Amino acid sequence: MSYLGVGVSPGNVPVYHGMNLKVIDRRVRLAELVLRCVICALGVLAAVLVGTDTQVKEIFSIQKKARFTDMKALVFLVVANGIAAAYSLVQGVRCVVGMVKGSVLFSKPLAWVIFSGDQMMAYLTLSAVAAAVQSASFAKLGQPDLQWMKICNMYGKFCNQVGEGIASALLVSVSMVVLSCISSFSLFRLYGGNKGKDGARW
């Protein structure tokens, strides 16, 4: 008996057919490859936008230059997105090689490594975006209680470019969360397949 391409054993344990498993794996890998390419491109874009952002302003005959290194949260954002882009590039190459060879991922240790790496990257990018958004809000709105000025009133171009970089980084973090869900599916379906085989034996 089958339902939606999934076989059901006498013990009512779903068992994926071999051919359907390959089709599912191909679609999952294609989605994974697209997301990794998006993360790589947007990660580089976010790092470049924030890392190259500068603006010089003359205040009381003194020139002051705003750069991303003035805010530690922006430095963290640049580093985190650079790491995420490099990681996604490596994993993207792995996806391409796997798709060319037509192999199906059955290695549990490798699946665990990919799952753990994606989880770490998701947490890293999310924390970087959260820290950058908080710092950017202080720069935009100021903090009257602490007598912090609205920096963006003086460095408008700098703040606008930082905002674009944070928006790109936000898309990276969201894509990374989706990708971690895909890698968790790829991992735990291996255990589901084993359970199905055990159920079929009974």
UniProtKB/Swiss-Prot annotation:
Localization annotation: Cell membrane
Acyltransferase as UniProt keyword: no
Domain of life, per lineage: Eukaryota
Annotated disulfide bonds: none
Pfam families registered for this protein in UniProt: CASP_dom
NCBIfam families documented for this protein: A_tha_TIGR01569 (TIGR01569)
Protein name: CASP-like protein 2B2
Source organism: Populus trichocarpa (Western balsam poplar)
Membrane spanning stretches: 30-50, 73-93, 119-139, 165-185
Membrane-related topology note: Multi-pass membrane protein
Subunit structure and binding partners: Homodimer and heterodimers.
GO cellular component, one term: plasma membrane
Family: Belongs to the Casparian strip membrane proteins (CASP) family.
Positions on the Cytoplasmic side per record topology: 1-29, 94-118, 186-202
UniProt keyword list: Cell membrane, Membrane, Transmembrane, Transmembrane helix
Extracellular-side segments: 51-72, 140-164
